[in-house]
Amino acid sequence: MEKLTIRDIDIKNKKVIMRVDFNVPLKDGKITDDTRIVEALPTIKYAIENNAVVILLSHLGRPKGERKPEFSLKPVSERLSELLGKQVTFVPELYGEEVKMAIDNAKPGDVILLENTRFDKGETKNDPELAKKWADLADIHVNDAFGTAHRAHASNVGISQYIPSVAGFLMEKEIKFLSKATLNPEKPYVVILGGAKVSDKIGVITNLLNKADKILIGGAMMFTFLKALGKNVGSSLVEEDKLDLAKRILEEAKEKGVEFVLPVDAVCAQKIESGVETKTFRINDGIPEGWMGLDIGPESIKLFKEKISGAKTIVWNGPMGVFEIEDFETGTKEVAISIAAETEKGATTVIGGGDSAAAIAKFNLKNKVSHVSTGGGASLEFLEGKELPGIASIASKKKIEN
């Protein structure tokens, strides 16, 4: 069912408490990547334009219920002020007199950022008392934090028990694209999965085996599948306790008529380092002991490009190799270029959060795909077909009866 968004309700001159995801990386108190702040701007600006008083809530890192200065949102308020071109009032508290005064003194269109929600241990416990304190500050709750949608916390879920909760624009976009990719994908539907472990992607594989036409596997997880097929993978990373599961997945794919594509060669080295000697081995010939696969090889890239070509829906989650090191980035880069090319031909392309999002950004292709998810764990659970608590708590559009 479709969710209500900030667009569907009247927020003019109202007090709006908005859960955003400002969980940005910091180094020596400076923000090293402000992407998450930038992603939240459209919803914040919309509320400002509608003369709402905007009260922002976010977590940052894992302070575990303690006030730790290195996890303060103060640097975020400074960056947000620059991006909005207006002063954001930072209140180093979560509730109480100082917060109430800031809100009482606010004029329509003002923005207030409260301190890190996880400075109170009630946040991660979804404590109803804490949720009520926040709900009492405002008329409406806007949830724009997809990155925490897989968590039931006080600031995104608990608060919806007391005041109406609607989706912000970023949340709306995430739901739209991830739903399109999981519920009603246009065919041919190609899923590309990478990363280190099969165990991280089991849920996604089993859910998407019912929907995908092709599943392409890269990254270190490919070696668990290849070893399950009896191939020699040398010293590559293998989850020994998942070999039977890998066999079962391969059998299930066969039964369901899903084309399950594994790499045919790998770029290998003896150490995961830059500038080391690399060799490409064909999988059928085997990888010698002491060598480990760190990227898909040139033949695999060619094969993957053929399989991606002509797709109408593509979901990509997890890199093809150790793309952070230039010697092992080619597979990930070429797959990303392929996905961008299909997007240009009209395909819907969704990139899961985390490492794939980092890869797409590294190769400057972020604007060449349909959607890059802002949530790593959240997008993974969505692709697994799970209902996320942070989405379930948003009010649904009522079906209008004739």
Curated annotation (Swiss-Prot):
Chain positions recorded as substrate binding sites: 21-23, 36, 59-62, 118, 151
Reaction catalysis annotation: (2R)-3-phosphoglycerate + ATP = (2R)-3-phospho-glyceroyl phosphate + ADP
GO MF annotation: an example: ATP binding
Annotated residues for binding of ATP: 201, 293, 324, 353-356
Cysteine pairs bridged by disulfides in the record: none
SUPFAM superfamilies: Phosphoglycerate kinase (SSF53748)
Pathway field: Carbohydrate degradation; glycolysis; pyruvate from D-glyceraldehyde 3-phosphate: step 2/5
Highest taxon in the source lineage: Bacteria
Any one GO CC term of the record: cytosol
Name of the featured protein: Phosphoglycerate kinase
